[in-house]
Amino acid sequence: MQPGATTCTEDRIQHALERCLHGLSLSRRSTSWSAGLCLNCWSLQELVSRDPGHFLILLEQILQKTREVQEKGTYDLLTPLALLFYSTVLCTPHFPPDSDLLLKAASTYHRFLTWPVPYCSICQELLTFIDAELKAPGISYQRLVRAEQGLPIRSHRSSTVTVLLLNPVEVQAEFLAVANKLSTPGHSPHSAYTTLLLHAFQATFGAHCDVPGLHCRLQAKTLAELEDIFTETAEAQELASGIGDAAEARRWLRTKLQAVGEKAGFPGVLDTAKPGKLHTIPIPVARCYTYSWSQDSFDILQEILLKEQELLQPGILGDDEEEEEEEEEVEEDLETDGHCAERDSLLSTSSLASHDSTLSLASSQASGPALSRHLLTSFVSGLSDGMDSGYVEDSEESSSEWPWRRGSQERRGHRRPGQKFIRIYKLFKSTSQLVLRRDSRSLEGSSDTALPLRRAGSLCSPLDEPVSPPSRAQRSRSLPQPKLGTQLPSWLLAPASRPQRRRPFLSGDEDPKASTLRVVVFGSDRISGKVARAYSNLRRLENNRPLLTRFFKLQFFYVPVKRSHGTSPGACPPPRSQTPSPPTDSPRHASPGELGTTPWEESTNDISHYLGMLDPWYERNVLGLMHLPPEVLCQQSLKAEAQALEGSPTQLPILADMLLYYCRFAARPVLLQVYQTELTFITGEKTTEIFIHSLELGHSAATRAIKASGPGSKRLGIDGDREAVPLTLQIIYSKGAISGRSRWSNLEKVCTSVNLNKACRKQEELDSSMEALTLNLTEVVKRQNSKSKKGFNQISTSQIKVDKVQIIGSNSCPFAVCLDQDERKILQSVVRCEVSPCYKPEKSDLSSPPQTPPDLPAQAAPDLCSLLCLPIMTFSGALP
């Protein structure tokens, strides 16, 4: 073959890669069609998985394309290429000993550390991932599967649970079938151990591992024997990942695994003289739970504690008291031997990839442009100029003791084996780091009791008047929930003798060993409003009494779907008292210019389109699923390799594969601003509600209520805005500016409808400094009254960008309000509506609460609080 020539297989893989990247550049929005593009990534994975040798071909082409991106400065393509590289390495069966592909990849991605965030952060994570794979081949696959299957080991005890929340009334039956298939137990512990051991030995020994023979011998082992072999193998991999030199780590791991194999009784199938054939070992299906969800709360997630209590029992996921005792002992040792700690703090170990396949936060830089093999093996731990990028890695996952330093392990023989390595690694921490941790413990030890959600402040009240907190936000339309208090074990519900720790809801410093709870929600903008209200309630409850956040860090995933047309009036529970009639379907609310022409059968998906504008890879692989019919997404994908090894292949629909891809590789959240509205009813009662996408007021809300009544809507009749009875409203709004200043306006309008929507439909609205709502006014210019006919309105529409607004009915004129296109959140007889950004619940009873200066007006207090945002996981986060 001539130099530069390619084979047919290479051409096919290159063509599939080009299809994956098509339309992701800056000109992607000019593409008028997008149906089928979401299958390109899945098709590429299917093509490559047919032969183990295809993975190396794809990796070479990804690196070549990445170098072109670096030369041309094509920012939009870096994140998809990095994710493709990560997922491909994760599934690669084995890297030959003479392959320098990972070294070239480290050299390539090292050049992107000077790019802006998030591109430099993504490359930092890739460098850490590559470093771990160089030292312990296949360790990232092992961690991911261990976490998803609930198989913790002593030194790495994290777990990942995936929960699918669907409303059967909202989604098609095909989606429900796929969700139920995912939640069906597919892998027994015996099968999971077998898969992990096959992968570990093949990743280390390559073609010299007789995979079919090893599979037969593992099948003959009992579950207890497999667990012992797996524990030794996994601990050896974790130890190898902490060795400084990659070549030495691989040699030690190979020797250790060979000894484990001989001890287990199958030496003939490991390190055979005659090389055999590599086998593709797919990632097993993650543990999933599927629930029917149509509430404004996440109370149903407490059932996960009941299902996972074996993994959550004290001493399995970690004993806080023992860890604190160890930290105190380490602090004492450092105080008596400060110079030793200062010297040892220069020795840092590389960080490990996160258990849920999210790339762990780490970086590495080289002192020169050319990266030799020797420099690459220690680019995370040994290069001092890694500090230039502002990166310091301090991961307790990298606490594995070096194999040749065993004398230190025997000094603390009374401790658990998994704690020996943590004990040694903590000696390497600097005194300043321990002081910071001690200070954080003192803050966490304070009471987390929270006050009810409060308003951002009255819009038109004088500054010298105190702002009274509104009544507690009410949960609306929550279905009856089982009382889990009698089912959960006592160690979960017993009052703690000291304040309980909880995981931060959103933090870059989360414990990488913490268990993860993935919450995947399906639906339209109506469902996104329910998620926002449930998230707000969850924060308030967890601030008062941590339960879920004591054991899990929460990740929220949003899968948009078109609302099902087969909604029946009897499918929805009865509405709250303010709702006029039983709701069924949520029609799509037309814009003011489309009133009377657009059908109401569907709700919008603006939130998902907003996420797609922020993250093109989310738009391609998640939002694009809406453009395909369910029968295509539910086709089965059969992997022949799994059939050859397991005997019972796991056939997953395309939709299931894409959902698992989204959950495993979407690691960066996009923060969606949550809004609150304080409503005053004609009786004087007040209530505070949460919304995230839209608030409809007046005729549009009343029409939605009539449409939701089902067959009764024909009897009531539906008029458009031209026939609606006008409302005289006083509208006071604050128009924000880039400088942060606000300009207030006060006007009186005669309107039929006033709608507030999140400004998220245009590319120019993505600037985070200009977070705003779009105020849509349907104003009556002139009303024509006739004795023989109905009154007829001449209307005009206008739009205003606002950040706060107050709407008051003149002479206490009542109107209806609908939140997030939700028929269950239609409130009648409202005379006053105040809308403002929502703030996080306050924490009371802090050890030293900050005192407000007497000269500071009460109106300014909300500025000291953080805005409440709903974190939705995406692949790249918000791109600059």
Curated annotation (Swiss-Prot):
Keyword Protein transport: no
Activity regulation (UniProt): Greatly activated by G gamma proteins.
UniProt-annotated location(s): Nucleus; Cytoplasm; Cell membrane
Modified sites of kind Phosphoserine: 458, 507
A Pfam family this chain is assigned to: PI3K_1B_p101
Source domain of life: Eukaryota
A Gene Ontology BP annotation from the UniProt entry: phosphatidylinositol 3-kinase/protein kinase B signal transduction
Region (Interaction with beta-gamma G protein dimers) residue spans: 653-753
Region listing for Heterodimerization, in residue ranges: 25-101
Gene Ontology molecular functions: 1-phosphatidylinositol-3-kinase regulator activity; G-protein beta/gamma-subunit complex binding
Membrane-topology descriptor: Peripheral membrane protein
Gene Ontology annotations for the cellular component aspect, listed alphabetically: centriolar satellite; cytoplasm; cytosol; membrane; nucleus; phosphatidylinositol 3-kinase complex; phosphatidylinositol 3-kinase complex, class IA; phosphatidylinositol 3-kinase complex, class IB
Region (Disordered): 315-339, 389-416, 454-510, 565-601
Residues bearing the modification N-acetylmethionine: 1
Biased composition (Acidic residues): 318-335
Tissue: Ubiquitously expressed with high expression in fetal brain compared to adult brain. Abundant expression is observed in cerebellum, cerebral cortex, cerebral meninges, and vermis cerebelli.
Keywords, ordered alphabetically: Acetylation, Cell membrane, Cytoplasm, Disease variant, Membrane, Neurodegeneration, Nucleus, Phosphoprotein
Comp. bias regions, Pro residues: 571-585
Main location: nucleus
Subunit composition and interactions: Heterodimer of a catalytic subunit (PIK3CG/p120) and a regulatory (PIK3R5a/p101) subunit. Interacts with beta-gamma G protein dimers.
Notes concerning its domains: The heterodimerization region allows the binding to the catalytic subunit.
Function: Regulatory subunit of the PI3K gamma complex. Required for recruitment of the catalytic subunit to the plasma membrane via interaction with beta-gamma G protein dimers. Required for G protein-mediated activation of PIK3CG.
Related illness: Ataxia-oculomotor apraxia 3: An autosomal recessive disease characterized by cerebellar ataxia, oculomotor apraxia, areflexia and peripheral neuropathy.
Protein name: Phosphoinositide 3-kinase regulatory subunit 5
UniProt organism field: Homo sapiens
